[in-house]
A protein has these predicted regions:
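Pyridoxal 5′-phosphate
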Residues: 1-388
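Conserved small/polar residues in nucleotide/adenosyl-binding loops
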Residues: 390-393
Length: 393
């Protein structure tokens, strides 16, 4: 039985072709630690880890590979920045499209006299740029923005927001969970102080690895969330300040970093623009096929230029969870349903509390997958109308 995987916004599947073999080779043949052993095999693995930092720094046009830090995921990265930067009395601005990876740590900090206000977005998820300056207070220290919505794919204008941040001397923190490896991100051009990303989505690596790219100023301003052994300055009982050690305590997830390196190599070989154009072509075909179907509501932007390859829908008269269940059980199509860990985004989009059915395309999907999804939706809508008509009679 062939399944069609359309949940790439959750995690890309399949991964880049050499990810699994590279991870297996490391575990089987070179499964040693780095920054600990003074032997050749350790140095060989260190070279791979450094190459991965270089690739990430180049991809995002960061300031220095030493300021590329590995974490377990984007949620950890955001927590490290949010909980390491803000102090009592600070005020933060966020958008109304933020994920719980931002909302929950910020809500925890309310108990520490750290407050936040929400920059409104319209019903397509686009931030209202002209509303930002009126929300800035004397004690505002940062703006945190979800680069692209995991609910509807709407892309925010990070370059313009970065300009506003610099004009008001604010830190600019970007959640790039849905855009890293998918579309160009220029840390310098967009004046981003902290870019938080995950490795298992657009970067085509395994689950369990993420990271953050910091400016030198941001790295100096942060208090490390986790302290421990680094393999350097071991005579000190305080954390070293050299980078990247200051934010990488304990044993790194070396198998997953090596897998991420393979994902990055695949993106380099295929070309990120080529992968992105393929995914957007699938998205455009899907949107074109959805528009004539009476009863289907497309959430967010109506064109591909302003969105990622993520499409959320609702169906008149049909429960979202039931639609997703039928897609999987009858048509073997895997999607994501519900609130997507982003209730504020759904409130903004008008889809709270039920949520949506989300389709998200990846590099391995085909136009045949799109056709299968559209065919299934046609049948589901037809059946929904038939049931509704029978009920009315």
């Amino acid at each position: 039985m062939k399944y069609i995987y359309l949940d790439n916004a959750s995690t890309t599947f399949p991964k880049a072709p050499t990810v699994a073999s590279a991870m297996s080779d490391y575990i089987t043949n070179r499964g040693i630690n780095i920054n600990r052993g003074s032997y050749a095999l350790a140095y060989d693995v260190e070279d791979i880890i450094y190459t991965t930092r270089q690739r990430l720094n180049s991809l995002f046009n960061g300031h220095d590979p030493s300021h590329v830090f590995f974490t377990q995921n984007v949620t950890m990265s955001l927590n490290m920045v949010i909980k390491g930067l803000f102090k009592a009395g600070d005020h933060v601005l966020i958008s109304s499209m933020e994920h719980n990876a931002v909302m929950r740590p910020l809500t925890q900090l309310l108990n520490e006299d750290i407050t936040f206000d929400t920059i409104p977005c319209d019903t397509t998820g686009s931030i209202k740029l002209d509303a930002i300056e009126s929300l800035i207070r004397p004690n505002t220290v940062a703006i945190i923005i979800n680069h692209a919505s995991n609910v509807c794919g709407t892309i925010q204008p990070v370059k313009e927001i970065g300009i506003i941040c610099k004009e008001h001397n604010l830190h600019f923190i970007v959640d790039a969970a849905q855009t890293a490896g998918i579309m160009p991100i220029d840390v310098k051009e967009s004046q981003i102080d902290a870019l938080c990303f995950t490795g298992h989505k657009g970067l085509l690596g395994p689950q369990g690895i993420g990271g953050m790219i910091l400016t030198k100023e941001m790295a100096q301003a942060l208090t490390p969330l986790i302290a421990g052994g680094t393999g350097s300055f071991s005579h000190l009982e305080t954390m070293p300040t050299n980078m990247p050690d200051a934010f990488e305590s304990g044993t790194l997830n070396l198998p997953c970093i090596i897998g991420l390196n393979e994902g990055l190599a695949f993106i380099e070989s295929k070309g990120m623009e080529n992968i992105h154009n393929h995914e957007l072509a699938l998205t455009e075909a899907f949107l074109k096929g959805l528009r004539p179907i009476d009863g289907i509501n497309i959430i967010g932007k109506q064109n591909v230029q302003d969105r990622t390859a993520v499409v959320s829908i609702t169906i008149d008269g049909a429960d979202a969870a039931s639609v997703a269940y039928e897609l999987e059980s009858t048509y073997h199509i895997m999607t994501r349903v519900g609130l997507h860990c982003a209730p504020r985004a759904h409130q903004t989009l008008g889809t709270y509390p039920e949520g949506t059915v989300r389709f998200s395309f990846g590099y391995a999907n085909t136009h045949k997958d799109v056709e299968s999804a559209l065919s299934a939706l046609h049948k589901i809508v037809k059946n929904t109308k038939s049931v509704s008509y029978t009920h009315l009679r």
